[in-house]
Amino acid sequence: MSSSQDKANLPANNSRARAKKLVLELQDEICAGLETIDGEGKFLEESWERPEGGGGRSRVLKDGKIFEQGGVNFSEVHGNELPPSIISQRPEAKGHSWFATGTSMVLHPKNPYIPTVHLNYRYFEAGPVWWFGGGADLTPFYPYLSDTRHFHSCHKNACDTIDKDLHKVFKPWCDEYFFLKHRNETRGVGGIFYDYQDGSGLLYKGQNANGKASKIAKELGEYSLNWENLFSLAKACGQAFLPSYEPIIKKRKNQSFSTKERDFQLYRRGRYAEFNLVWDRGTIFGLQTNGRTESILMSLPPLARWEYGYKPEENSREALLTDLFTKPQDWFTDKSLEKRCLTHQALD
């Protein structure tokens, strides 16, 4: 790498302060927006300190009009000894003090027709090593194709403001990351996901060398994005969240539901809990770095259920979720999706 490339890949002089300010502002904007959307619920804030260095503020909304439970966290942690999960991915960071900051959010609505949603944007530094990561994904229980397309469109547009190739990789990467291997299904309908973005190399930096995201990244070739590009990406994607989710709530919040729909929602929430406890790297990182357990596990649903050997009734609305919406799809280009959803009144 040339010296000019080295310079291009250096973080901004005030990188840590700017990254912290960005995620704090995202937390504030999202919480204010969600309180307005809910109309009744209010976030309660609890600040905490990490003995080894740093801390954060956790905000939780319970028993609102729309949201059964939701949390929006901010954390800024630092230390001298890197957790194993980081060293295994970036061994060159070993021996350096480190800094990490981010905001994360999970919302569990009451109405089964309103999807659960997750967001996370973060920044990490350790000596010469730095990167941005983040994304947002939607987990419906009674999905609609129009809702799915709207969510994806908002996040694609945000990525496109930086580079029109980003979404080509980040969308399949999301499908790959939020995948329950033991269930052979995605957690939901996806969105975007990216990690270890330091402005160099291929866009895909995940673990599945033979997957779709990796294949597309190889076709695109090496990318040269700088710190400012990636900072702007996190900002654009973070600010795309409320416009991507609020219209879905407005369309679905007054739909009536029965015990049957509620039971299915709780059953599918069990899948959400399984992913977060078994596969999620953020959970693993937080526990390995002695983060605040209550905040780390805030993403878990307030209620969930498991049922041995459950199978949805054939051709039912529940079967549509497991047959179509828990598998990676090309939501915009595959026209067969419209016909299948129309049959189940799941188009709009």
Swiss-Prot record:
One of its GO terms (molecular function) is metal ion binding. The keyword Oxidoreductase applies. Residues 272-307 are annotated as: Important for dimerization. It is an enzyme of class 1 (oxidoreductase). Its EC number is 1.3.3.3. Substrate binds at S104, N120, Y121, R122. The active site is at H118 (proton donor). A divalent metal cation binds at H108, H118, H152, H182. Involved in the heme and chlorophyll biosynthesis. Catalyzes the aerobic oxidative decarboxylation of propionate groups of rings A and B of coproporphyrinogen-III to yield the vinyl groups in protoporphyrinogen-IX. Belongs to the aerobic coproporphyrinogen-III oxidase family. This is Oxygen-dependent coproporphyrinogen-III oxidase.
